């Protein structure tokens, strides 16, 4: 599996936030296995254990912009019970949150606020873009709406829909957990490589392409 290596590069020529450089590399732990089987397997076990704890204890930042936030909050009710994924502890401060859900329309005046709140979140941190407006501006193709929050912050998971259902938000959590389980992050700020390795997961569009092409009979809206 290929990984995207991200390193902070404040002196680089990148004019977009964040100031970093990226490159596609192979799994760094495989190199440790080739050098030393014992230490390589130990690194694998340590990363698996740390990633297991991270992905099963995701605390979302309580931050909503529009109607998509209503659907997000609905997933916290007993009907959907998002507590099964360890993501029911809403945080009112970005310094205590693990990931941010940008749910709704991002206006130009709100973009600096979102970026500053993202900067206040501690590493490791992730971002979910929820809804068509957050993904690409939606139906608001005007000067006052940002055409996608990935213009100023990195996004890990995109949720399509206007607005998405609570089940879509829960699926996004599961996809984020799957991605976190494959990450390779520094175990300490003084131990090992300080780069962040994120697995290049296959998109849901590509994964379901053959299944969708094979569909020949479409149900009417009243049959769904």
Curated annotation (Swiss-Prot):
From the Swiss-Prot or TrEMBL record, what is one GO molecular function term? 4 iron, 4 sulfur cluster binding
Q: Which Pfam families match?
A: Oxidored_q6 (PF01058)
Oligomeric state and partners? NDH-1 is composed of 13 different subunits. Subunits NuoB, CD, E, F, and G constitute the peripheral sector of the complex.
Catalytic activity annotation: a quinone + NADH + 5 H(+)(in) = a quinol + NAD(+) + 4 H(+)(out)
Q: What is its main location?
A: membrane
Report the co-factor binding details: Binds 1 [4Fe-4S] cluster.
Q: Keywords in UniProt for this one?
A: 4Fe-4S, Cell inner membrane, Cell membrane, Iron, Iron-sulfur, Membrane, Metal-binding, NAD, Quinone, Translocase, Transport, Ubiquinone
- Residues binding [4Fe-4S] cluster are 67-68, 133, 162
Q: Name one GO biological process term.
A: electron transport coupled proton transport
Determine the domain of life of the protein's source: Bacteria
Family of this protein: Belongs to the complex I 20 kDa subunit family.
Question: This chain belongs to which protein, by name?
Answer: NADH-quinone oxidoreductase subunit B
What this protein needs as a cofactor is:
[4Fe-4S] cluster
Question: Which organism was this protein described from?
Answer: Edwardsiella ictaluri (strain 93-146)
According to its UniProt record, the EC number is 7.1.1.-
Keyword Nucleotide-binding annotated: no
């Amino acid at each position: 599996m290929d990984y995207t290596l991200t390193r902070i590069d404040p002196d680089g020529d990148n004019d977009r936030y964040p100031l970093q450089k990226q490159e596609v590399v192979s799994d760094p732990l495989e190199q440790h296995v080739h050098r030393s089987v014992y230490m390589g397997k130990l690194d694998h076990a340590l990363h698996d254990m740390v990633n297991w704890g991270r992905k099963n204890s995701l605390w979302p930042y309580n931050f909503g912009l529009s109607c998509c936030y209503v659907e997000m909050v609905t997933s916290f009710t007993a009907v959907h019970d998002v507590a099964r994924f360890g993501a029911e502890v809403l945080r009112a401060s970005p310094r205590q949150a693990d990931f941010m859900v940008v749910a709704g329309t991002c206006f130009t005046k709100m973009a600096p606020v979102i970026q500053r709140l993202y900067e206040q979140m501690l590493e490791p941190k992730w971002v979910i873009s929820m809804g068509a407006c957050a993904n690409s501006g939606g139906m608001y193709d005007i000067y006052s709406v940002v055409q996608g929050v990935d213009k100023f912050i990195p996004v890990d998971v995109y949720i399509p829909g206007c607005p998405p259902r609570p089940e879509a938000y829960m699926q996004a959590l599961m996809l984020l957990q799957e991605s976190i389980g494959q990450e390779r992050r520094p175990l300490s700020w003084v131990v090992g490589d300080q780069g962040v390795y994120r697995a290049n997961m296959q998109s849901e569009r590509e994964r379901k392409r053959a299944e969708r092409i094979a569909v020949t009979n479409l149900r009417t809206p009243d049959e769904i």
